[in-house]
Amino acid sequence: TICDGETFNIQPTDNSPTEIVPVGTTYSWSAPVSNPAGAVTGGSEGASQASISQILANITDYPASLTYTVQSEYNGCKGEPFEVVITVNPTVGVDAIADQTLCNGDNTLAVNFSTTLSNNSNNVDEGEISYSWQNDNTDIGLAASGIGNIQSFTATNSTTGPITANITVTSVYTYNDVSCDGESATFSMTVNPSPLVEFSEDDQFITSGDTTVPVTLSSPTDGVTFTWTVAAEDGITGLTTTSGTDTIPAETLFNTTTEPLTVTYTAIATGDVGFDCEGLPTDYVVTVNPLAQVNPVNDQVVCNEENLLIEFTTNITGGTMTYTWT
């Protein structure tokens, strides 16, 4: 048994005393017979050859054979005709596979390989078809190679731009314990990044009544848009905008309590139409400290040269209070 397009070579050997093959024996044969008819090409008659050898092709989707009736000859003496049967496995392909475009963190669709064969109208024995594949970019989260179908996996992209893996699948046809590589098909998996959000300013700390610095949103990934929402702790007043896109505006904020409060802007970057992928929410925090306050200090009356201690206190919490006096 050989693969489609291969050369077979048979050189009868001496097995005395039952099978004697003198050195110099030649072989001749008439045109071989294909089964099924016309399934195997490349066979032709031969005369006075040192061995039986030809290149054969199987033009069907199933195993087919070619039968040679061979006549040996040595020094003008002819031996008994004998048959040589060569089975030729077919070359089969791989059905087209759809490309996939995904976002970082998505689960891929499982890829189940298949091969469409012509009708087995001659009811010949069929072999088994298996598949092997090669992946040229393991950064997407898929191994460099494998055998059989590709199960669903989590696609990854740790860069700021799209990455693509090209996966080449090859069919393998096995019959009579002979495995023959078939045709290949290639498909791609493109994994788009989760765009990051970057802020033009560090988190801000202000005092009640102060105005924040405007903040511009950006991303190392090209072609993204931004959305943000804001949440403030109870006791914050002065917010005029509750959502936006690429700029967090200046706000004059007030803290009506005695402890620091925060205003949290949560921003999300989304890829453009080419890859509609959302990044992870990213927070930008403004801390609004309360106005410093000193509790009233009682007047004191002391005697001459008596020690005097005046302690300052505050109801403000959440930080360190210092005092100056004149």
Positions of predicted regions on the chain:
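Extracellular low-complexity Ser/Thr/Asn/Gly-rich intrinsically disordered segments
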Residues: 1-326
